[in-house]
């Protein structure tokens, strides 16, 4: 197995003491005097196809190889089945609290390379789209009569940020682990609405950022939610730091599904480029159902899993229960 470690510029950091495997060491820029690396400064010579794994240390190598901007968000995680993110250990000198995160990332990276950890992807029989009324009714009935869990996860995909400015494209739902669907809103009629409301009356409904989703379900369908939860607010109980509460961030940190929206993000970027559209002008109604369904369904799957984890943790801590 061939492994490479890439840092921003050559340094004296002893990475060998953190890993028990051999690796080749590279620098994105060979000039160690550079403080800020520009595109023209990158002179690394590496054939990434010759390596099974690339450990990317710090934000510059991470951004160069993955086109992602936040190495902290992906710290210790896998991207594109090849790249492993690691925060720069130099930051521990002025931010000692980062040591725990660094050590956990080292353990995670070692696990991926050894094969003990794997990024999971659900099959089409577990995560899929629905555009048929009978199938929606069957799914909702199964959700109502499932006695193993007293909650469901619910998410919405919309054409705009504000409910008065657009329409709901579809909703995602999960009523059991590792099983989620994305339903096209075109199949919602009076029968489906009645069945959905029955479900909402009988079980707790879990959102991630309920402030957003509630307005859409209430404004466009007049749904009522007698008992709902919010995994975003729950996470604030554990970590009040800003920028750490998004669903994607939490999925990467707390689940084995990782950055499951990566392919969707790539599709959007390609669409913008091919059609000459600015990102600010893009809306989700431009994404075909067949492209959207798998990723939207995963939102509900992840929300369901996060709620299980967070509620269990809260129940074990009397100081966090309300």
Predicted regions: what is each one?
Residues 54, 206, 299, 303:
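Conserved anionic group-binding/transfer micro-motifs
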Residues 66-75, 79-93, 102, 106, ...:
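Metal-dependent phosphoesterase core characteristic of DEDDh/y 3'-5' exonuclease domains
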């Amino acid at each position: 197995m061939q492994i490479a470690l890439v840092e921003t510029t050559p340094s004296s950091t002893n990475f060998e003491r953190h890993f028990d495997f051999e690796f080749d060491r590279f620098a994105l820029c060979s000039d160690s005097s550079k403080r800020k690396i520009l595109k023209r400064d990158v002179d690394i010579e590496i054939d990434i196809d010759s390596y099974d794994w690339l450990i990317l240390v710090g934000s510059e190598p991470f951004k160069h190889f993955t086109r992602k901007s936040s190495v902290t968000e992906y710290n210790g995680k896998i991207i594109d089945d090849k790249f492993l993110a690691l925060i720069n250990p130099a930051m521990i000198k002025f931010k000692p609290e980062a040591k725990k995160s660094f050590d956990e990332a080292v353990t995670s990276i070692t696990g991926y390379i050894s094969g003990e950890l794997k990024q999971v992807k659900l099959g089409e029989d577990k995560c899929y789209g629905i555009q048929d009324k009978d199938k929606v009714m069957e799914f909702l009935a199964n959700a109502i009569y499932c006695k193993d869990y007293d909650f469901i996860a619910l998410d919405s995909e919309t054409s705009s940020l504000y409910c008065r400015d657009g329409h709901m494209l579809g909703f995602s739902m999960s009523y059991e682990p590792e099983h989620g669907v994305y339903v096209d809103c075109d199949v919602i009629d009076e029968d489906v609405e009645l069945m959905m409301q029955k479900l909402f009356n009988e079980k707790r409904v879990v959102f991630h950022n309920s402030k957003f989703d509630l307005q859409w379900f209430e404004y466009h369908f007049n749904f009522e939610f007698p008992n709902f939860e919010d995994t975003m607010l729950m996470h604030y109980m554990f970590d009040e730091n800003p920028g750490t509460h998004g669903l994607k961030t939490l999925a990467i940190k707390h689940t084995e599904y990782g950055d499951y929206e990566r392919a969707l993000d790539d599709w959007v970027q390609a669409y913008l480029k091919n059609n000459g559209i600015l990102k600010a002008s893009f809306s989700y109604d431009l994404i075909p159902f067949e492209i959207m369904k798998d990723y939207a369904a995963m939102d509900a799957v992840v929300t369901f899993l996060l709620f299980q984890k967070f509620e269990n943790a809260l129940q074990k801590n009397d100081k966090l229960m309300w």
